Amino acid sequence: MNQQTTNRDTGEAAATNAPANSATSTSTPDNQPTPLDAFEVLLITGMSGAGRSHAADCVEDMGWYVVDNLPPKLLIPLVDMMTTSGSGSESGVHKLAAVIDVRSSYFDELAAVLGHLDDLGVKTRILFLDASNEVLIKRYESVRRPHPLQHGNRLIDGILEERHLLEDLKERADWVIDTSSLSIHQLSTKLYEAMLGSGPTTVAVHIFSFGFKYGMPIDADFVADVRFLPNPFWVPNLRELTGHDKPVADYVLSSKGAKEFLDAYEKAIEIALEGYAQEDKHYVTIAVGCTGGQHRSVAMSEELARRLRAHGLNVTVSAREQHKRHSS
């Protein structure tokens, strides 16, 4: 998935005439303001090449007003303008999404700006797009463009510098999405699930199966290892099937320890989800791994999803290694 460049208002011009030191909504009979506690700000950030621009497109489709490469110091004047002018109320837009990267001016002021927005009662969330160094290198090489922090050095040097600069922001993020193995369509789906699939007291759950032989996932909140179960790969009539097929699912789920593991894991997940909802975390990723990601992990992922859906949870399932076959 190559990051596409989009052209939007940069926000500087929009904020030029906004009061710089006030974000207090005022009202006139013909021009009603948007209350600050009804206004939302989303920061879209992350590694260059990880899909920020596509994420911005998706967020725009969800009804957010999107501004590209906005210097953090202009966030408050822009929010002030959109709330005090009444333009937000007239247009029905109460949500501002700003794409911010390390090239934005005064990036180090972002923490103070976020604190100010919190003090004003503006709901502010952070979406962080990430990808492995290897994938970022391949994406940059495919488009033959330099990294914004490369400065004539090696591509990996620019990537590592950016990763270091974004460490604190990643820690503060409400959503961290790793796009290393995602297509544009899969990223869109994941964004919609994360941002629209949950309410203020519910948590959207995404479960995916994977193979340990292809690497550990880096974006999972929970990782379950089901390699303790008998491997259908070594059963001749099951080898060419996957955990989506009933014979494999029956074999895996009837194995010694499968039910006991699912019972315990289901209970642990329920407890964690209740806590996450209280902490305003609305999206949880569960990875279930076996050796090759074809049999045991797929069957167990589907069964875990079925159980969680029975509790009324919004659960989606995918198989990371679905295009890889003949693997245990």
Swiss-Prot record:
Keywords: ATP-binding, GTP-binding, Nucleotide-binding. It holds the Pfam family PapZ_C. Residues 13-29 have a biased composition (Low complexity). InterPro entries: P-loop_NTPase, RapZ-like, RapZ-like_N, RapZ_C. Residues 1-35 are annotated as: Disordered. ATP binds at residues 46-53. GO terms for molecular function: ATP binding; GTP binding. GTP binds at residues 101-104. It comes from the Bacteria. Disulfide bonds: none annotated. The keyword ATP-binding applies. PANTHER family: RNASE ADAPTER PROTEIN RAPZ (PTHR30448:SF0). Belongs to the RapZ-like family. Displays ATPase and GTPase activities. This is Nucleotide-binding protein BLD_0430. It comes from Bifidobacterium longum (strain DJO10A).
